[in-house]
Amino acid sequence: MPKRLDINTILVIGSGPIVIGQAAEFDYSGTQACQSLKEEGYKVILVNSNPATIMTDTATADKVYIEPLTLEFVSRIIRKERPDAILPTLGGQTGLNMAVELAKSGVLDECGVEILGTKLSAIEQAEDRDLFRTLMQDLNEPTPPSEIIHNLDEAYGFVNEIGYPVIVRPAFTLGGTGGGICHNEEELIEIVTSGLKHSPVTQCLLEKSIAGCKEIEYEVMRDSNDNAIVVCNMENIDPVGVHTGDSIVVAPSQTLSDREYQMLRNTSLRIIRALGIEGGCNVQLALDPYSFQYYVIEVNPRVSRSSALASKATGYPIAKLAAKIAVGLTLDEIVNPVTQKTYACFEPALDYVVSKIPRWPFDKFESANRTLGTQMKATGEVMSIGRNLEESLLKAVRSLELGIYHLELDHLKELDKETMKKRIIKADDERLFIVAEAIRQGVTKEEINEWCEMDFFFLQKVENIVNMEREVKANVGNMEVLQIAKEMGFSDHYIAAAWNKTEREIYDMRKENNMMPVFKMVDTCAAEFESATPYYYSTYADENESIVTDRKSVVVLGSGPIRIGQGVEFDYATVHSVWAIKEAGYEAIIINNNPETVSTDFSISDKLYFEPLTIEDVMHIIDLEKPEGVIVQFGGQTAINLAAKLEEHGVKILGTSLEDLDRAEDRDKFEAALTKLGIPQPVGKTATTVEQAVAIAEEIGYPVLVRPSYVLGGRAMEIVYRQEELLHYMKNAVKVHADHPVLIDRYMVGKEIEVDAISDGENVFIPGIMEHIERAGVHSGDSIGVYPPQSLSEKLKEQIIEHTIALGKGLNIVGLLNIQFVVFKDQVYVIEVNPRASRTVPFLSKITGVPMANVATKVILGQDLVEQGYGTGYHPEEKEVYVKAPVFSFAKLRSVDTTLGPEMKSTGEVMGKDLTLEKALYKGLVASGINIPTHGSVIITVADKDKEEAMEIAKRFHEIGYNLLATAGTAQSLEEQNIPVQVVNKIDSEDYNLLDIIRQGKAQFVINTLTKGKQPARDGFRIRRESVENGVACLTSLDTTRAILRVLESMTFSAHSMKEITQTKRHEVVHA
């Protein structure tokens, strides 16, 4: 059936900010979909609240709205634009839930808008646990024994009948939010309560636990003609019981017999047909390892994380084709863009193995519960490709950016058998490493299988790796052993340590012996047809398929997996850089390993290498391609950290030189540069021992800011208020020695300002200055940023511009730089300079219309700013106000403290824009998920140091009609100021207390500031966690609270009695 001609305008709904469970994969799918629809000649309108994406670039759609994804704002856009149809299935769970809400509100009928792709009835049938279960029964498809529940009593009824353990799956939620496995009554109460709270329809499915079965996924496509194909099937190495987003996954499945494969394939196709899904769909199944009994777990009637993985694993662009199917095209009409010869109805075939390993945020949140279950905790993932599973797995391990080069972790070597058993049974983020350690220590595969039901095939592969380690150690210098180790994916780093040589020596040894990898193409058809994709992976085999052209080329290093501190913003910069390289006439080559992102879409660059970002893997590509140079500025800290080693190998670093990069990163050199330029900075020194640290802190005076040098996202950064906290930090957070010094700075309580600039060495151009709402001390990534600055005097602005220009020239920056200033007592100090793209680049690029990464890349390639139409100075400010608000994923990470400080905790960001600061703030806060009711109750419990400041805030809350609740200490201070307050019991009280109020939803806001430094102030911690678990906005910064008050005050009509008004007037007359 040809494409539909009865519709012209399509509204695409994006997925909003990055949170755990919904990351960069929707930037990739949304971008593909918009381009795909434009190719077909439709007018595309996009709404999304996330400014950090390629998707929200003005070029992606005909009209782009960066607005909150709420019923209020999306309805407004529909009424204004009057689209013929909406396409929600590419916006993740957010998009689906929005479609359901829009349909129920009546706005789609009112405006005559239809839902494209998967129909509303199919979405509801797949997402509503009750409807789905009924459909499976009609199809005779087995599901685990289960019960739909709406309250705790119903849950007890089911458990009494079936027994523990049971799995709780909330309806219409993302990444298993609120769900989990219950082994006893205590867990049942906690998880069911949380699940019902997180489900927008207050519904959970309780099912008998089938943990231990194999978890298999099928990624399926269907069109309106009922053509249906399997794009890819995948197998979780972790059995059922761990969320698929937290599982290590391989494609294609490795342990299924042909009969099992066909049986599950037929089931998947039968389900997608019964649901009537048009587009992409993900089916999750459980298979009993000892029989042919299987169960259907769930269906995602949309493009998902798994479909991004399947697209990158096969080269088959699911989202692009799903968009074409949505407008009526069929699979047998669409040409496969990879082969450009076959049609999209050919099922992809793989002649390699793909591994995906999740990237968790536990390096940031040491206190988080690391146990994995049905609620997802990973922020991102890496993917790798190899010719055998061992190679594929080891490449994925070294892609994780955790400083790991092999399937072993030093700290696990001390574990005894009992501890290993416990951790393997319970499953945490290190389980695969513990399995390898257990095998090293002689535990049998049979025992491990008994503990965790991981398939023998996978255990055998881990054992093969361990056996090879022994071979490597026993045969130092043996070239045959080296060859086999390399074919299994062993890194030079590991072999060098085993052979007591340097990594470079092993690399050179292989080069002399012609032991270098070749590059194979990902072509969707196992080389059956000729293919046009420039998409490659390395392996040790015979024929090299990556043909080097005679064009001049430039390599861009990507930023690896999405994690806190290094999000999709860096991918945005990478993609823009690649486009600029192509515009400048060079061949653009990208190296990256994140399957979720736009940068790893093979249509973006001239060549894509899907490889780990380690010196060895990058050098293999550079040796083959011999580029003009490498750009490291856009890949975050990942790429910057490779610069020195690349230069040692004789590779040219384009842009800011290594020496100048080091001058901005190395404390002493940076101080010297600032002194020379006459730019002030907070007093600070470097310590290489604990004693030195104590002495420096005494000399500077507390509070001090402590951090290791060379970090991203404020990792292990803290503000400490006294000596015992400093000693606690030195002992627990960092291992200080001469190579890893600790920086100690005077902590200045001032206004923080952030600037992004582009320098060509002569000229420095400043697209924008941003002011942070939270004072210095809250990480810039967790602060609310405002552009243009609202409270900076012209004099201070000029100081900031002068310092920025001086730093750009003085540090010889070529390309981008990001500077953080603090304004303290009317004086501007520099906190830090990052000689690279920062996380604010996409935000400022969109607002100012200056494509910063693009301009910077052209500067790096030799085209100065004046040639590009920019000069030195500050870009004229926009009239509207723009707010960048952080988004957190605390609900997914139990036992993480939500207090904001110098260590970054947010996973994503949203933008609000309007004519006034209050309106822009309102949009930003609402888009970030904070509910802003105009009346209600606010609980105030603040540290003594904040009491005075909190009084003014409490008074303003009272004036707009809020009830104030406080514990005795804070209440007394309020009463002294004649502010009405209701005293509530502290949390250790047996009676009705503060936590009960939060649990019962009787408070709209909780204001809670951290008492003293970091030693766990348990009460405060429990208050903050309880707020998160119950969806109550918990404000840990008084600056954020003030921002919310501004919004509330602007929404509230003032109500003063006539007497008050006349008294004021009389007062004025007297003065006249």
Curated annotation (Swiss-Prot):
Region annotation (Oligomerization domain) ranges = 402-546
**For this protein, what is the EC number?**
6.3.4.16, 6.3.5.5
Q: Which Gene3D superfamilies match?
A: 3.40.50.20, ATP-grasp fold, A domain, ATP-grasp fold, B domain, Carbamoyl-phosphate synthetase, large subunit oligomerisation domain, Methylglyoxal synthase-like domain
Q: Region Allosteric domain: which residues?
A: 930-1072
- Provide the binding site for Mn(2+) 3: Q820, E832
Q: Which residues bind Mg(2+) 2?
A: E298, N300
Q: Where does ATP 2 bind?
A: R707, R746, E752, G777, V778, H779, S780, Q820, E832
MGS-like domain residues are 930-1072
Tell me which cofactor or cofactors this protein depends on.
Mg(2+); Mn(2+)
CC annotations in GO: cytoplasm
Family per similarity comment: Belongs to the CarB family.
**PANTHER family, alphabetically?**
CARBAMOYL-PHOSPHATE SYNTHASE [AMMONIA], MITOCHONDRIAL, CARBAMOYLTRANSFERASE FAMILY MEMBER
Per the record, what about its domains? The large subunit is composed of 2 ATP-grasp domains that are involved in binding the 2 ATP molecules needed for carbamoyl phosphate synthesis. The N-terminal ATP-grasp domain (referred to as the carboxyphosphate synthetic component) catalyzes the ATP-dependent phosphorylation of hydrogencarbonate to carboxyphosphate and the subsequent nucleophilic attack by ammonia to form a carbamate intermediate.
Q: What is this protein called?
A: Carbamoyl phosphate synthase large chain
Its gene name is carB
